[in-house]
């Protein structure tokens, strides 16, 4: 929900969070599988972080570019990107399946734990909580006290007003969706590298769609996300 909030505040209806999470997780899994026996663990994790952020950002950039240039319907384009991401994960599940013919990847680097994110106090969930808190603080400051956050608010209220005061709407749309997609990609990293240590087409578990409702119920306020009742 944190990842979708800046886009929603801009009135860009990013329904593609699920796909952006999947593609970020796929990028993390690719690093674990392809680099796990070639590079030190710390370097692999660094590559996973960069790859997941970049993959999510690219997945967010594509519908943003079409929206900015040709005013396409972002609800449809982001939704369709979910299906593409799902099929990509399904394809690479077959490519990387272990054992062959099983139709699944299984636990990645189970013997070496290369690419597994560190646990805090023996829990694989605490790291995700810490990251969520840090991003919440960042997002609150970004949306309420930065020039970029102000531009997001103005574009969300009225694109015509934004253009009148000299805000480059196309730039704001693309920049905001790069951020939104990157944060979704980070979620994929945490799911693959920190919790599940594998990737499947269902690894996001519908969180991308649940996040839409949670973000709405919190009125796009990062600090209120934790008080919003989950619809699940």
Short names for language-model regions:
Residues 1, 42-43, 47:
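Membrane-interfacial amphipathic/re-entrant helices at transmembrane-helix boundaries
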Residues 1-34, 53, 57-72, 215-221:
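Single transmembrane alpha-helix segments in multi-pass membrane proteins
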Residues 1-2, 39, 58, 63-64, ...:
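Alpha-helical transmembrane segments in inner-membrane proteins
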Residues 4, 8, 28, 32, ...:
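Structural signal for membrane-spanning alpha-helices in multi-pass inner-membrane proteins
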Residues 20, 24, 28, 51-52, ...:
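Alpha-helical transmembrane segments in multi-pass membrane proteins
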Residues 74-145, 198:
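Transmembrane helix-bundle core of multi-pass membrane transporters
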Residues 121-198, 222:
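Helix-loop-helix "hairpin" substructures at the membrane interface of multi-pass membrane proteins
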Residues 226-231:
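Conserved small/polar residues in nucleotide/adenosyl-binding loops
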